[in-house]
């Protein structure tokens, strides 16, 4: 077969579609993600790969990809350990420093323990845990990745 002279179409990822967490009790997850964080419970179904596991989808009002976090219920599983192959945290975007401060005050009023606002150079954030111990982050968009290097040089500076 003759090789094509055309360059193959460039493959581009469009961002995250969703993140799935393993939880012990979906009722606690509904209480937290819907009633505390304000996400819409978009879908209640079962895991396509294990129909014994309930699968809940939370997201924005339209359930758009990129806004969703899903929970698979496995009440019989033990708590996991942090290590290679595990995920450290999931970050949600908030619009501004003022919104981040508002979220922090609101979470504390709901007895959700969270960190002080942390300056991460490229954004500011607050960390908290969901009822199953997953680390969640609320993060601002700015000041952005170009705060210490120009756009055209992003990712070229050596680390360490």
Labelled PLM ranges:
Residues 2-3, 13-14, 23-27, 48, ...:
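Vicinal oxygen chelate
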Residues 5-8, 75-81:
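Short beta-strand/turn micro-motifs at beta-sheet edges
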Residues 6, 14-21, 39-40:
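The feature marks the first
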Residues 16, 39, 56, 66-69, ...:
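Short, structured motif recognition centered on aromatic/hydrophobic residues
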Residues 22-65, 119:
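Core segments of cupin and vicinal oxygen chelate
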Residues 60-63, 75, 95, 131:
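Short loop segments at secondary-structure junctions
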Residues 67-73, 141-151:
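Short, basic, helix/turn surface patches
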Residues 73-74, 118:
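A conserved beta-strand-loop-helix scaffold within acyl/acetyltransferase catalytic domains
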């Amino acid at each position: 077969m003759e090789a094509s002279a055309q360059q193959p179409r460039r493959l581009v990822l469009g961002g995250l579609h969703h993140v799935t967490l393993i939880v012990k009790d979906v009722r606690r997850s509904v209480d937290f993600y819907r009633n505390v964080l304000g996400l819409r419970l978009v879908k209640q179904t079962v895991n396509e790969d294990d129909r014994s596991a309930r699968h809940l989808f939370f997201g924005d009002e339209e359930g758009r990809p990129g806004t969703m976090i899903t929970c698979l219920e496995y009440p019989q599983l033990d708590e996991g350990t942090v290590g290679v192959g595990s995920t450290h945290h999931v970050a949600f975007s908030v619009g501004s420093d003022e919104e981040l401060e508002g979220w922090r005050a609101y979470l504390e009023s709901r007895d959700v323990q969270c960190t002080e606002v942390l300056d991460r150079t490229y954004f500011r954030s607050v960390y908290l845990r969901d009822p199953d111990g997953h680390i969640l982050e609320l993060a601002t968009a700015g000041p952005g990745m170009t705060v210490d290097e120009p756009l055209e040089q992003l990712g070229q500076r050596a680390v360490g």
